[in-house]
Amino acid sequence: MSEVENIIKRARIAQKEYESYSQERVDLVVSSVAWAILEPGRNRELAELAVRDTGLGDVDDKFKKNFRKTLGLVRDLQKAKTVGVVAHDPLTGITEYARPVGVVAAITPSTNPGATPINKILNALKCRNAVVIAPSPKGLTTCARLLQFVHAQLDLVKAPRNLVQMLPDPITKDATHELMRLADLVVATGSQANIRAAYTCGTPAFGVGAGNVLVIIDEHANLVSAAQKIAQSKTFDHATSCSSENGAVLLDAVYDSAIAALEQAGGVLLDAADKQRLHDVMFNNGKLTSTLTAQSPAVIAERAKLLHPKAGSARFFMVEETGFGPDAPFSGEKLSPILTVWRAPNFQSAKELIAHVYSFQGAGHSVGLHTASSGAVMEGRADDLASHLPVARIIVNQAHAIATGGSFENGLPFSLSMGCGT
């Protein structure tokens, strides 16, 4: 019997015991396990480990992300009924019962080696499942430390430790694929190669959509507010989130003013020569490399040898683009504080441009709009985008990376795994 088979065997034994828990006891387990990362000292340690071992992101932002995303998820799960009868329609006589799926294989990325695993763990436990984490190789140490905290919290409520396990070191593709094949459900967050592997493993699977979020700034927008929100989102955790804006489409009527507002918010617009220097480091034969992924602007400026006089003090960089697709790699996802900027004559042209970009990369995820704060214009344009673009969410007048995956300021549920729909 392989090591993965042994892990699955232990998970099934633990899950069978857990399946008999009442709703009250399940909720106690979820609340206890959430403290594995909500406790400030543990959270700080995990944030520091994540940045140290992966080389990605920012410690303070990961601390905030770990706390906010976990607290929001606990809030969302708190009142959800997941044991026994969950719905009954006396008119049709139909009664719905909640049943666990069994063992969940949770594939997690290096960009969020603490926040994404705990998110998947809590969702699985809420539904009386066991879960096995397949972390990225770089995120293994962070995940292992998280599971030590999780097991301590399971001990406190006398729940089986084997409800939550992870693949052992070294993390290999073969072990991850075996886990996906043997589990009852796969929930995959990570590279598109991992998502494709999840969908073709023969086990029911949920996979995230490819990121490449674009946002429109139209002639009705509060430009200062829009620029500040884009900067907040673009710089958070050095843009590790797939919900971070990768590009902005600015309408002609406000183009120069919007660029000025973005510069005031800390952006630095690079000239063609610096754009080429950035390109030469970021891409290899049109494919994104990891050289600048989730790095600070200062590191990016140094590695790309940027010559702009403000490059060293930038909060984020901007590059102008006119095309899209493989021949315009800046039109794709960059996972770094680099914002691609397009100019469009009007709203309809902006919408059509985004549709073209998403046909290259980003379909199924989300789009942003900065426009009037209320009224027919805002509602009409949001409706237009929702009706015509291949996205799951339209985020209006908000910092995209903060809002898309759930926020205390909007009604969206909290998640670190944005599905791509059908």
PLM segments and residue spans:
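Terminal low-complexity tails and localization/encapsulation signals of metabolic enzymes
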Residues: 62, 84-88, 92-101, 297, ...
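Flexible, glycine/charged-enriched surface loops at secondary-structure junctions
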Residues: 20-25, 45-47, 160-163, 236-242, ...
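Short, flexible turn/loop "capping" segments at secondary-structure junctions
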Residues: 7-9, 207-209, 237-242, 328-335, ...
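ALDH superfamily catalytic-core signature
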Residues: 118, 126, 195-325, 350-352
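N-terminal Rossmann-like NAD(P)+-binding subdomain of aldehyde/semialdehyde dehydrogenases
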Residues: 1-95, 123, 264
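Structural signal for hydrophobic packing residues in well-ordered secondary-structure cores
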Residues: 12-15, 19-22, 30-41, 50, ...
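Conserved C-terminal structural/oligomerization subdomain of aldehyde/semialdehyde dehydrogenase
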Residues: 19, 28, 307-422
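Rossmann-like NAD(P) dinucleotide-binding subdomain of oxidoreductase/dehydrogenase enzymes
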Residues: 82-225
